[in-house]
Each structure stands twice: as structure tokens, then as C-alpha cells.
């Protein structure tokens, strides 16, 4: 196990112990839902299987439940529910940020798509086109852009709803990339790779 992963896990472990009883309850609930998804979620099991077949098996301990930085969430227009660390290969699930187990399932699936892309396609996360492609795929394949999720966000569309959601969320994510100078650059990156990346559903046969 890499030293980078150990350092990242230790930092998250330290954070987990600082939030009092409420934080511990959130982390316990997160772990319970995570355990269920790793046993029963079709999308999670499918991605875990294909990651293993590709030589990138994901041990359960590499999927970490921990509190996320509330100041970062407050500064974002899209509250954070998870993340993927290219350096360590670990996935973070933000304990206390999920309104349902289905929400966690979509988040974990999203981050596993990033991990799949990182493993198979050697993504350069500082390259905006690379980042945009993985965000398009992760948002499209994870269930993040289901109509019910969009309604919960207060976004109601009846024409090309899925595509518009994927595009919007991909632009938001790329805009947050440290290498991205502004939203316009993020939009250009998403537009440049849109056709090929939206059509690429690997390892799924179709959009989940």
C-alpha cells in the first residue's frame, strides 16, 4: 500500500475523531451504507469487478468514510459528497452528506468511474480535456443526472435533461481544477471532448 495513501487515510482518520458524537454517528452510518453497497449495488459491484479485471482492484479500506471540509462545501455551488485522490487511488465518501443510500450509491459509482478512467486511460488530471472527459463519463454513468436528482436540485427540464445535466456538472467540476483559469476554459474543454466522451460508456454497455 502506497505511503501517499497511508498519509491521506491518516489525515482523514484524524479529522474523523474531531467532530464529536454527531460526526461519529455520521461515519458509522456511512460505513454501514458503504458495506451494503459493496455487497449489493449492481453498479458498484460491476465497476469493482472490471477494475479488478483491469489490474486495479479496490480494497474496501481504500473507500474511506470521513467528514469533508464544511468551508469548502459552503464555497461551492454543488455541495461535496465524495472525491477521488489520483495520488493515493483512494475514494472519499463525505460522512453526513448523504440524504439516502441511493445518493451514496451514485456518488460511489461516480468516483469509481474516475478511478476506472485513471487506471485504464492514464488520465492527466492537470489536462482540462482529460478531466472534462472523465467528468462527462462519471456524471453520465453514475445516476447523478437522473431526473429525480435534478428535481431535488431544483432543476426541471423535459428536453435533453440528461445531456444538459452532464454538461453543466462537468463544467462545474473542471472549473474547480487548479489548472483551469476560468469557466470559459472549462466550457471549451467540455465542448471539445463532448461527442466522444458522452458516447463512451465503458465498462457499461449503456448509460446506467
Report each predicted region and the residues it spans.
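Pan-zinc metallopeptidase signature
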Residues: 1-28, 156, 160-208
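Eukaryotic basic, amphipathic alpha-helical target segments in cytosolic regions
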Residues: 55, 116-124, 142-150, 178, ...
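Surface-exposed beta-strand-to-loop junctions
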Residues: 84-92, 115-120, 166-170
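Active-site recognition of the HExxH zinc-binding catalytic motif
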Residues: 106-118
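Post-HExxH zinc-binding segment in Zn-dependent metallohydrolases
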Residues: 120, 124-171
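Short pre-active-site segment immediately N-terminal to the catalytic Zn-binding motif
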Residues: 91-108, 124-131
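Auxiliary, metal-adjacent structural segments of Zn-dependent hydrolase domains
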Residues: 2-101, 147-151
Amino acid at each position: 500500500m502506497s505511503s501517499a495513501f497511508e498519509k491521506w487515510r491518516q489525515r482523514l482518520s484524524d479529522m474523523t475523531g474531531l467532530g464529536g458524537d454527531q460526526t461519529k454517528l455520521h461515519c458509522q452510518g456511512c460505513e454501514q451504507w458503504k458495506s451494503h453497497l459493496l455487497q449489493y449495488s449492481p453498479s458498484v459491484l460491476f465497476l469493482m469487478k472490471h477494475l479488478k479485471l483491469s489490474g486495479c482492484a479496490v480494497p474496501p479500506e481504500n473507500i474511506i468514510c470521513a467528514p469533508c471540509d464544511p468551508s469548502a462545501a459552503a464555497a461551492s455551488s454543488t455541495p461535496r459528497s465524495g472525491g477521488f485522490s489520483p495520488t493515493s487511488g483512494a475514494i472519499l465518501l463525505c460522512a453526513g452528506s448523504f440524504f439516502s443510500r441511493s445518493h451514496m450509491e451514485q456518488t460511489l459509482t461516480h468516483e469509481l468511474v474516475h478511478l476506472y478512467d485513471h487506471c485504464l486511460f492514464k488520465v492527466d488530471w492537470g489536462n482540462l480535456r482529460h478531466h472534462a472527459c472523465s467528468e462527462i463519463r462519471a456524471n453520465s454513468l453514475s445516476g447523478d443526472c437522473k431526473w429525480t436528482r435534478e428535481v431535488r436540485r431544483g432543476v426541471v427540464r423535459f428536453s435533453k435533461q440528461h445531456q444538459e445535466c452532464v454538461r453543466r456538472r462537468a463544467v462545474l467540476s473542471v472549473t474547480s481544477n487548479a489548472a483551469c483559469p476560468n469557466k470559459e476554459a472549462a466550457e471549451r474543454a467540455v465542448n471539445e471532448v463532448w461527442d466522444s466522451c458522452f458516447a463512451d460508456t465503458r465498462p457499461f454497455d449503456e448509460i446506467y
